[in-house]
């Protein structure tokens, strides 16, 4: 869902608000809550939730371990929910021919560096490079070669584009920037 005119190209970047993150956040939250809700009643000696019987679980050591697993599981689930809420990693790439500037903007974690904006001059762009590694989980990443710096990734590693889509995206961008395209 890119937007492009003669002088400007904007590419939105999806962040943490993906279905897989929602699924993992729900799974870890429910799992941690389940462990905790089985461990606590073993200490109290009565069931809080009839579906989760805890009469057969002795508090020392099983109940303590269940509570520990429940509390420990809440940390990664809290982290996942926060990254989803803050949409960490989302942003956009702006290629502006009039100003001669490329701006890569991403949202980070709250704090002093929440807004991450990296600017390059279009004169410093040497090429657009496609990195392809075929394996069990293929890796297809679009890079921008910048003079005197490391290659800058323009797509996420987990972005599941086919090889054809990746090449088309690279070719469009290379044409827009008037630079060469390097393939695998």
From Swiss-Prot:
The lineage of its organism: Eukaryota, Viridiplantae, Streptophyta, Embryophyta, Tracheophyta. Seems to be required for the assembly of the photosystem I complex. This is Photosystem I assembly protein Ycf4. It is a multi-pass membrane protein. Keywords: Chloroplast, Membrane, Photosynthesis, Plastid, Thylakoid, Transmembrane, Transmembrane helix. It comes from Huperzia lucidula (Shining clubmoss). The keyword Transmembrane applies. GO terms for biological process: photosynthesis. It is found in: Plastid, Chloroplast thylakoid membrane. Belongs to the Ycf4 family. GO terms for cellular component: chloroplast thylakoid membrane; photosystem I. InterPro entries: PSI_Ycf4_assembly (IPR003359). The chain crosses the membrane at residues 22-42, 64-84.
């Amino acid at each position: 869902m890119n937007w492009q005119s003669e002088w400007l190209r904007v590419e939105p970047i999806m962040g943490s608000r993906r279905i897989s993150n929602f699924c993992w956040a729900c799974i870890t939250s429910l799992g941690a809550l389940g462990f905790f809700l089985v461990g606590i009643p073993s200490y109290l000696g009565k069931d809080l939730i009839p579906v989760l019987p805890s009469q057969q679980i002795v508090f020392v050591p099983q109940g303590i371990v269940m509570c520990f697993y429940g509390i420990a599981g809440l940390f990664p689930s809290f982290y996942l929910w926060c990254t989803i809420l803050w949409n960490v990693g989302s942003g956009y790439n702006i290629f502006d021919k009039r100003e001669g500037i490329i701006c890569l903007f991403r949202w980070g974690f709250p704090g002093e560096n929440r807004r991450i904006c990296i600017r390059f001059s279009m004169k410093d762009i040497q090429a657009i490079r496609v990195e392809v590694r075929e394996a069990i989980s293929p890796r297809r990443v679009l890079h921008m070669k910048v003079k005197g710096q490391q290659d800058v990734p323009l797509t996420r590693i987990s972005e599941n584009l086919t090889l054809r889509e990746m090449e088309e995206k690279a070719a469009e961008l290379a044409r827009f920037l008037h630079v060469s395209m390097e393939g695998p």
